[in-house]
Amino acid sequence: GAMEDLDALIRELKRREMHLVMDLVVSHCSDQHPWFQEAVRDPAGKYGQYFYLKPGRNGGPPNNWRAEFGGSCWDRLPGSDLYYFHTFAKEQPDLNWENPEVRREICDMVNWWLDKGVSGFRLDAIINLKKDLRFQDGPADSPDGTCAVSKMLPRTAEIGAFLNQLKRECFLPHDAFTVGEVYSITLERVAEFGGPEGYFSTLFDFGHFLAGHQGPFWYQYKPFDFKTWRDAIFQAQENAGSAVFLANVLENHDRPRAPGIFLPEGDACYESVTALAALSVLLRGIPFLYQGQEIGMRNGEFPTVEDFEDLNTRDQY
């Protein structure tokens, strides 16, 4: 669509006393973005400082960090001996938030959208803004000697300056609603990130997602255990208390459909799926429904790997 379509959407939403919350991705950009193209053209110039560019080591990447979608976090900068860093796909180079010019450009962009009439944002992968600038090897957790980047990125004790700048210069002046996609903080620090005194209005409760993990790879889950799931939800609710109105979520774009996870195989019927829906809306907090969840959508079945579009699935295959 065109910008005129968005303007019309915002106008009609406000006329109906509704609000538009957009996805906001500020941890990385596209490798087709003019900033990155300028960095490729002149790595030593201004825009080379907008990214993490490092020389290789022993003929390979600067360290052993493994990207979220598989493979190294480092790819060779075209036409250069330098490597650029990416938490996710190689087409998504990470922005250098240590650079005040990057932060200024991001804040200007966020305010542009808020001035246009957007009412708030879901902040994607926001915990990834802070890096350990030493970029040292991590403990290998895979037979190939690599270490999951998720173990090396979270520097939540030092990320506050970045998030406070966004709140102070963008969110507060516009009374914007914000929800953070924050996977790695402890329960004790929830109020630091969400609520009136936190960086965001609220944050997603992923505790019961993480309780099912049993390895460094995305597909390594324990068999579903009701008590573990229940306890994780209760702990998050009790810990949030009156400080944070959590964003409750049972499924999202990174996860299979809820009936396929939380219901015994063959037991996903109208009544059981409706019970999951009741959980979504009756817990204290803000219910977030992923598209299709409102009709109890189930997982699709794909007979061949060619039918999958998911990067992780294809890479693992």
Regions found by a protein language model. Name each.
Residues 1-317:
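Active-site and adjacent substrate-binding regions of carbohydrate-active enzymes
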